[in-house]
């Protein structure tokens, strides 16, 4: 229903704000809207979960934004480069060793098909959590959620979550990064939490 690039514009026209963030474990989409717009925004999220539209031009534009973000936040910051390399050394068999933003060479190759494949694999009601706060009661939210999301079919592609474990480290892992841009020497020390 909602055309590429229109979601945020609609939220803005409704007097709201929206944004998103990604972590190692989740991607979150959130909106700040008035209570009288809650149903409409929940319907928009249900539509996005089932009918995402991705135009090639939009994907390429967003890919370039991510590349620039990586350059400015990681590549141009020695501390961030070291942090990223430390995580990669610490988590050699776990997804936490992969930067949330991704590696530069992988981002550069991102295509519309890659994005749609990821969407089809992970975006489903049985892989989502709805959180609502504000001037609403749990009963009101549950009624809306049942009406709007209740008929969405779960995805068979979503399997039981695999919780990979990093094998016990038997030797120290040390990294040294020398960078003329670093203002002062810095020591980072990472450890895996005990099981």
Question: Where do the PLM segments sit?
Answer:
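Conserved short hydrophobic interaction patches
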Residues: 48-51, 144-152
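Residues within well-ordered alpha-helical secondary structure of globular protein domains
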Residues: 13, 44-47, 65, 121, ...
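Acidic/histidine-enriched alpha-helical segments
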Residues: 53-71, 137, 156-171
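Non-catalytic beta-strand/loop surface segments
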Residues: 2-37, 73-127, 151-195
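Solvent-exposed, non-transmembrane alpha-helical starts
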Residues: 39-42, 76, 143
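M16/insulysin-pitrilysin zinc metalloprotease superfamily fold
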Residues: 32-63
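Non-catalytic, conformational "gating/processing" segments within enzyme and secreted inhibitor domains
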Residues: 63, 113-148
């Amino acid at each position: 229903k909602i055309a590429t690039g229109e979601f945020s514009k609609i939220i803005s026209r409704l007097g709201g704000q929206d944004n998103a963030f990604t972590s190692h474990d989740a991607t979150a989409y959130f909106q700040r809207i008035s209570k009288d717009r809650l149903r409409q925004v929940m319907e928009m999220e249900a539509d996005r979960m089932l009918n995402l539209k991705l135009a090639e031009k939009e994907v390429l534009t967003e890919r370039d934004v991510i590349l620039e973000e990586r350059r400015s936040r990681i590549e141009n910051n020695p501390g961030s480069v070291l942090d990223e390399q430390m995580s990669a050394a610490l988590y050699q068999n776990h997804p936490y060793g992969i930067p949330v933003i991704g590696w530069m060479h992988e981002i550069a190759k991102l295509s519309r098909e890659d994005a749609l494949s990821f969407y089809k694999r992970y975006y489903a009601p049985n892989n989502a959590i709805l959180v609502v706060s504000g001037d609403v009661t749990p009963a009101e939210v549950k009624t809306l959620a049942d009406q709007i999301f209740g008929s969405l079919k779960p995805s068979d592609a979503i399997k039981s979550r695999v919780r990979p474990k990093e094998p016990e480290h038997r030797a120290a892992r040390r990294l040294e990064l020398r960078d003329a841009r670093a203002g002062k020497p810095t020591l980072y020390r990472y450890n895996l939490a005990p099981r």
